Amino acid sequence: MKKYFSFDKNISVQGRGFYIAAAGGAAYQNLSHIRAALQDQGFNVSLEDRSQDMGMLSLQGPYSREILSKLTQTPLDNESFPFNTNQMITVAGHRVRALRVSFVGELGWELHIPRASCVPVYQALHQVRYSQFIP
């Protein structure tokens, strides 16, 4: 049986564990592959799929840092928040995981947001974008 494992994901160390974010189209296959590998290797670990509990917003482009900085106290400069890292931050009063990534060759973040906070975070980002960056 051929196993499928997509490399379109972000994996980061979280204390003694890992945070894995996979692209939506390949998430199920990735989860199945990881579960099978854990079982095959006999690792004594737990794996929790939080896909249904989370949403994701992608904020990309040259103004992404300025827009996000209007809604968080977290420093977003290159030294404080290097490329390809992630941090738990507060955005518009909501705790989110911010991943500094780029899909367009420019500055950008992915925000992984608890389901209940998705709409308020989106609305806050949208308001900042239109009130300050769109003439």
Give the ranges of each region predicted by the language model:
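Basic, glycine/lysine-rich polyanion-binding surfaces/domains
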Residues: 1-135
